[in-house]
């Protein structure tokens, strides 16, 4: 089986990707995980909720997830989920809208402490509602697979603190793929991996380290996860962009 991660930046482009990139077979025979960055930004503006963007000591940019922001995040992700499910159903796919909260599908743990660089100083933040993934309930997910195509919004549930969590969509897809023994992990993004201004169409996992100098932010994270995925038994990792496709093996 295959796990597909739909990036938040391409949700609005699904119709074009369906028509021009031939993703119908990919989306119809998979477990789908999605992000929703655009929806979060739009809803926060409408609700007048300011989202603070911080940078970790390693240079990664992230949203600070306060309790107020968490409410926006959950609502926005559910909106994104409905948009994807509606699109897929219009294409004849029996899509099933889910979040990690449903039947405790994705179990997470709130990060008790995160670090950010603010005004040149490393600051500890203890009231954030982002989390790490601890478990994927594969039994429940297999039940949904018997009747349709699961579409999972990237929200996890922390049973100890009884709270939803903001979790990284790429990491949700990665953990679902490992837990379900998927053969392929497929990232549907706005761009394939590029080096020297050109799309890298094929990339052996054992050469990824040499290419990291060309990757930043989310792409660097995808490449490192791809290497871990291949080493864990996943056959292929694909990064499908509007400009081409990178296959990592």
UniProtKB/Swiss-Prot annotation:
Places the protein is found: Cytoplasm
Family annotation (InterPro entries): AceGlu_kinase-like_sf, AcgluKinase_fam, Asp/Glu/Uridylate_kinase, LysZ
Biological-process GO terms, alphabetical: arginine biosynthetic process via ornithine; L-arginine biosynthetic process; lysine biosynthetic process via aminoadipic acid
Keyword Transferase tagged: yes
SUPFAM superfamilies the record matches: Carbamate kinase-like
Pathway(s) where this gene product acts: Amino-acid biosynthesis; L-lysine biosynthesis via AAA pathway; L-lysine from L-alpha-aminoadipate (Thermus route): step 2/5; Amino-acid biosynthesis; L-arginine biosynthesis
Binding, substrate: 63, 166
GO molecular function, one term: ATP binding
Residues annotated as site: Transition state stabilizer: 5, 222
Pfam families: AA_kinase (PF00696)
GO CC annotations on file: cytoplasm
EC numbers on record: 2.7.2.17, 2.7.2.19
Organism superkingdom: Archaea
Catalytic class of the enzyme: transferase
Keywords attached to this entry: Amino-acid biosynthesis, Arginine biosynthesis, ATP-binding, Cytoplasm, Kinase, Lysine biosynthesis, Nucleotide-binding, Transferase
Catalytic activity: [amino-group carrier protein]-C-terminal-N-(1,4-dicarboxybutan-1-yl)-L-glutamine + ATP = [amino-group carrier protein]-C-terminal-N-(1-carboxy-5-phosphooxy-5-oxopentan-1-yl)-L-glutamine + ADP; [amino-group carrier protein]-C-terminal-gamma-(L-glutamyl)-L-glutamate + ATP = [amino-group carrier protein]-C-terminal-gamma-(5-phospho-L-glutamyl)-L-glutamate + ADP
Role according to the record: Involved in both the arginine and lysine biosynthetic pathways. Phosphorylates the LysW-bound precursors glutamate (for arginine biosynthesis), respectively alpha-aminoadipate (for lysine biosynthesis).
HAMAP family: LysZ
Family in the record: Belongs to the acetylglutamate kinase family. LysZ subfamily.
Name of this protein: Putative [LysW]-aminoadipate/[LysW]-glutamate kinase
């Amino acid at each position: 089986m295959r796990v597909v991660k739909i990036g938040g930046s391409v949700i609005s482009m699904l119709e074009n990707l369906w028509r021009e990139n031939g993703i119908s077979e990919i989306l119809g025979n998979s477990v789908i995980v999605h992000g929703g960055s655009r929806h979060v930004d739009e809803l926060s503006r409408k609700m007048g909720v300011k989202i603070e963007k911080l940078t970790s000591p390693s240079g990664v940019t992230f949203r600070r997830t306060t309790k107020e922001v968490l409410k926006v995040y959950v609502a926005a992700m559910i909106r994104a989920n409905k948009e994807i499910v509606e699109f897929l159903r219009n294409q004849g796919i029996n899509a099933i809208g889910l979040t990690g909260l449903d039947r405790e599908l994705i179990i997470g743990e709130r990060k008790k402490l995160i670090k950010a660089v603010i005004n040149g100083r490393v600051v500890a933040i203890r009231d954030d509602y982002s989390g790490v993934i601890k478990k994927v309930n594969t039994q429940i997910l297999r039940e949904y697979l018997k009747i349709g195509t699961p579409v999972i919004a990237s929200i996890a549930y922390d049973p100890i603190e009884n709270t939803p969590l903001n979790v990284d969509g790429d990491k949700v897809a990665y953990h679902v793929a490992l837990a379900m023994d998927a053969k392929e992990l497929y990232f549907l993004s706005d761009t394939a991996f590029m080096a020297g201004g050109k799309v890298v169409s094929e990339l052996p996992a054992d050469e990824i380290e040499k290419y990291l100098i060309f990757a930043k932010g989310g792409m660097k994270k995808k490449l490192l996860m791809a290497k871990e995925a291949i080493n864990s038994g996943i056959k292929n990792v694909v990064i499908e962009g509007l400009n081409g496709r990178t296959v990592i093996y």
